[in-house]
Amino acid sequence: MASEKKQSNPMREIKVQKLVLNISVGESGDRLTRASKVLEQLSGQSPVFSKARYTVRSFGIRRNEKIACYVTVRGEKAMQLLESGLKVKEYELLRRNFSETGCFGFGIQEHIDLGIKYDPSTGIYGMDFYVVLERAGYRVARRRRCKSRVGIQHRVTKEDAMKWFQVKYEGVILNKAQANTS
């Protein structure tokens, strides 16, 4: 009995809640619509536009002007997109890419690295990947009736997220100093 491997608690397993792909163009117009087409082609969903919060004259941005687009992907499609994004980054992330709440994010320079064929009329766009991790039971904080808080022991921490990334994707986590030398 003692020699048997202890079963892990299925409630403690970490999973991807959602993946958010964001392209921030910084201006409205034709470049933004082409960026939204890239996201739609990549995810199969129609993207949502983000508006500027306030006017910045030096950037030429007015308040409530559409300046970025993003799409939220869940389930198996999110896992596939995350895998392709991490492949571009060669499964290497910085320690500062992970937040205290167990989320992490990274960016890529060119969307054509994900396997999309280059189209001269569209151009090349970089994008950000944001991954939100959770454990089973996080619904208690989101549900409408009898809303409650997730306990401190059950929350995903920065260390939990980094360990999950290293185990699941055999990823490498670099410090800032290591990233500059390579």
Curated annotation (Swiss-Prot):
GO cellular-component term (any): nucleus
Domain of life of the organism encoding this protein: Eukaryota
Gene Ontology molecular function, alphabetical: rRNA binding; structural constituent of ribosome
UniProt key word Nucleus: yes
GO biological process: translation
Cell compartment(s), UniProt: Nucleus; Cytoplasm
Keyword vocabulary terms for this entry: Cytoplasm, Nucleus, Ribonucleoprotein, Ribosomal protein, RNA-binding, rRNA-binding
Presence of keyword Kinase: no
Job of this protein: Component of the ribosome, a large ribonucleoprotein complex responsible for the synthesis of proteins in the cell. The small ribosomal subunit (SSU) binds messenger RNAs (mRNAs) and translates the encoded message by selecting cognate aminoacyl-transfer RNA (tRNA) molecules. The large subunit (LSU) contains the ribosomal catalytic site termed the peptidyl transferase center (PTC), which catalyzes the formation of peptide bonds, thereby polymerizing the amino acids delivered by tRNAs into a polypeptide chain.
Annotated family: Belongs to the universal ribosomal protein uL5 family.
Subunit structure: Component of the large ribosomal subunit.
PANTHER family: 60S RIBOSOMAL PROTEIN L11-RELATED
Name of the protein: Large ribosomal subunit protein uL5
Species, as recorded: Oryza sativa subsp. indica
Lineage of source species: Eukaryota, Viridiplantae, Streptophyta, Embryophyta, Tracheophyta
